[in-house]
Amino acid sequence: MDSSYLRISLSFLFWALLLSPAVSQSSSCSSQTFSGVKSYPHCLDLPDLKAILHYSYDASNTTLAVVFSAPPSKPGGWIAWAINPKSTGMAGSQALVASKDPSTGVASVTTLNIVSYSSLVPSKLSFDVWDVKAEEAANDGGALRIFAKVKVPADLAASGKVNQVWQVGPGVSNGRIQAHDFSGPNLNSVGSLDLTGTTPGVPVSGGGGAGNSRIHKRNIHGILNAVSWGLLFPIGAMIARYMRIFESADPAWFYLHVSCQFSAYVIGVAGWATGLKLGSESKGIQYNTHRNIGICLFSIATLQMFAMLLRPRKDHKFRFVWNIYHHGVGYSILILGIINVFKGLSILNPKHTYKTAYIAVIGTLGGITLLLEVVTWVIVLKRKSAKSTKPLKA
């Protein structure tokens, strides 16, 4: 009995010792200490990106001292902590960005006055900062730390709160930080910081709701456009191309084609409108290629809809010209639509299964198209052969 108890005790001790290093690597407010520097009475385990903020505030001179800690999204990446004096997002914020020099391994801090996402170059902040430095946190999973003192603007000091933004990214190339992910945690990493620390139980407010709403709108935008430009338009084109070859399908194929394309257009316009709305709400975030293709798609698809009103009769002399125009614009919409769906997927960066599923759907439609193309040509050639072998009437 005693030996059995001893074996159980030793086994428990073994597993406890084995797991203890992993537990110690999980950083939090209570586990972080700083040697040789001042103490920070307030600390927040921020809700996203495994970030931690230690801070103190001297109301007599409106000085905010901070230590921001977070692991970069990839080894060799960067971290950033910022105050936005006017808004709640990254655009317009005054940022401190830390990264390690790849050749020396020394961590340093760069300041960025982020006017827009397309212009991320080192620049002076709109308020004073000093005692700025960066370091790699020992035994903290590759996390970086930013130390700084900030002169809080008078209007923010009077309110007792500042809008803080934090972020992590994959790397630095030629002195420029590489774009961070646009997934949920990266969009939710904003909030309000109580300078006095009197409300530690609610460290962040207003960030998650705004981020979740934006993600929801992006998802709606993506679904609408994938269904319209990326699915219904190709199916509508296939109906017109391959059903009309069967004489019994006339004029049913025409009404099916029009119904499918009109539905695709209506859904596509809704998706285009949500894209414009997202653009207006995301100051400084620009996806020029995706945006320009979207505008082009809306424009030529609208022309295609109006062209149906000017469709000449089959025996009209301009019907041939109209057919060339209609087919050319239609295939342009088809190609641009599929390209822009993939552009959108790369921006949304959803789970890999979504992109795989769309590729599978498009691949299936492509396979069906090849099969129907062969069938169509066989039918056409047989009809021509039958006509050529018919005896001429006397």
UniProtKB/Swiss-Prot annotation:
A GO molecular-function descriptor: metal ion binding
Domain DOMON: 49-169
Presence of keyword 4Fe-4S: no
Cofactor(s) the protein needs: heme b
List of residues binding heme b 2: H257, H326
Short name of one Pfam family: DUF568
Protein name from the UniProt record: Cytochrome b561 and DOMON domain-containing protein At4g12980
